[in-house]
Amino acid sequence: MMLLLYQQVCCWGFYAHQVINHQAVFSLPPSMMAFYKPNIDFLTVHAVDPDKRRYIVDAEGPRHFMDLNRYGSYPFDALPRNWDTAVEKYGEDSLRKHGIVPWWIHIMLARLTNAFRQKDYPRILRLSAELGHYIADAHVPLHAN
């Protein structure tokens, strides 16, 4: 019974990520939709790639959440927005222990921007699908407390 429940929970998580990435395409400006809409199936299927890596790659887990309550109270003015500054203030081990999703989103966005500059379309698609996953994770209340 526990295995069945586990499978249902995992499947719902995968399904939610796929729906979010799929629907996100329709909120894009027309100039971006021209590229993304023909590739909507790729973005949908690969929305779950980060979760597939989560228990295989040690560094992956902390990219999916952040224990915000560890950093004071809203609006978290003392929390550094820059990764290097955050590492100086809290140490990398502590940051990884409590999750790095906002900083990882920034890193992924920089990689995606670089892929656009290089016109590396396969990389653009992969990074877009994964960035959608991390942004969605950042908005899950249980991933942010």
Predicted regions and their residues:
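N-terminal, motif-rich segments that launch catalysis or mediate targeting to/interaction with membranes
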Residues: 8-130, 141-145
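Functional cores that coordinate and move charged inorganic groups
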Residues: 132-135
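Bacterial N-terminal signal peptides
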Residues: 1-8
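Active-site microenvironments of hydrolase-like enzyme catalytic domains
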Residues: 138
